[in-house]
Amino acid sequence: MVVLDASIVNIALPSMQVDLGISDADRQWVITAYTLAFGGLLLLGGRIADYAGRKKMFIIGLIGFAFASFLGGLAQTSGTLFAARALQGVFAAILAPAALSLISVTFTDSKERAKAFGVYGALSGGGAAIGLVLGGILTEYANWHWTLLVNVPIAIIAVILAIPFVRESRATGDTKYDIPGAITATLGLVSLVYGITKAESEGWNGTQTILFMGAGLVLLAIFLI
């Protein structure tokens, strides 16, 4: 679902834009809101999964991802859709590393583990292509809402199977989380990208362009320091 959702809405973007009145400049936030939240919180999500419990965070990630998908699928405004996509990214940042960690601890034999990671890699690699095809089919024969709602039954099935078949595990040691750092990096990326998008309408010398790009660079510099 994590990889699938990075591409499944691409074909549906024109329909979303017309239905929700999204401007050309803001249309990319359907994609960007998801990828920024996912990428910005991925390391933090992996650390939380390792120490809070991989199975628990995997299930929480699935439920949260399903809820965000449901919220986005029912969106009637662009703001709701953007927020839902960002929320999907947040829970994807928990779900993806938890899934990888579970594979690592479940398959202790090196050969079996290699096979499991091979299957995971194949599914992840094909997920983007499948997302484009599935997004086109759902948009053509249903509507764009289903490009998000399709995640709900998938997540429900995954939760039902995970509860009895996946065993809990967690790492030991230092459990400190760099939450301020993750938030700073994510906000910096969002501000920087937003400033770049404003350049299309206001120009590179526009007040908002300079303000948001400057704020983004400052936040990223703080994160690196």
Residue ranges of each PLM-predicted region?
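Transmembrane-helix bundle of Major Facilitator Superfamily
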Residues: 1-164
